[in-house]
A protein has these predicted regions:
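Glycine-rich phosphate/diphosphate-binding loops and the adjacent beta-loop-alpha structural elements
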Residues: 22-33
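Alpha-helix N-cap/helix-initiation motif
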Residues: 33-34, 46
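Phosphate/diphosphate-binding loops
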Residues: 43, 48-61, 65-105
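Intein/HINT protein-splicing elements and their conserved insertion hotspots or analogous self-processing inserts
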Residues: 80-81, 85-159
Length: 159
């Protein structure tokens, strides 16, 4: 998978200072289930590059993650979000103060890539993971798995 190759790239130290590492197809639908990225961030720090590269993913991070890591990016790659359209060599600008991520591509190029994009083929056609991937909502809504949860706005916890 794309995510597996990206993680292996980090583990094997196949990137350079200033790179932005993209791990996609790890969101609620694409994972499915938003796998933890701690192994990848641990490898980056273990190689002494934690302060020299950024990591962007539609997956998730634990509280142990350090460095310039951006997770829960949505819409996720598996539903055709912008992260699915990125390619090696694309220049990406991250502005942490403004809270923006932009790729330096023309609208025409992005439209061209969107036309060519096809959903990633999943390697399971039935069972629990398939059912989960078919019903789960986006991360920004809490990855709900029931139709009513996608529109639920009431918080039931005392905070």
């Amino acid at each position: 998978s794309i995510a597996r190759r990206q993680r292996q790239m980090c583990i094997r130290d196949r990137y350079k200072d200033g790179d932005i590492i993209i791990i996609r197809y790890e969101g609620p639908k694409g994972g499915p289930g938003m796998r933890e990225m701690l192994q990848t961030t641990g490898a980056i720090y273990g190689q002494g590059k934690g302060e020299k590269v950024a990591l962007i993913t539609d997956g998730r991070f634990s509280g142990a993650t350090r460095g310039f890591c951006i997770g829960h990016v949505g819409p996720e790659a598996s539903v055709g979000g912008p992260i699915a359209l990125l390619r090696n060599g694309d220049v990406i600008d991250i502005d942490a103060k403004k809270g923006t991520i932009n790729v330096r591509l023309s609208k025409k190029e992005l439209q061209k890539r969107r036309k060519k994009w096809r959903p990633k083929k999943i390697n399971f056609g039935n069972g629990t993971l398939w059912k989960y991937a078919q019903t789960v909502g986006p991360a920004y809504l809490g990855a709900p798995t029931h139709p009513g949860g996608k529109n639920e706005v009431k918080v039931y916890a005392d905070i």
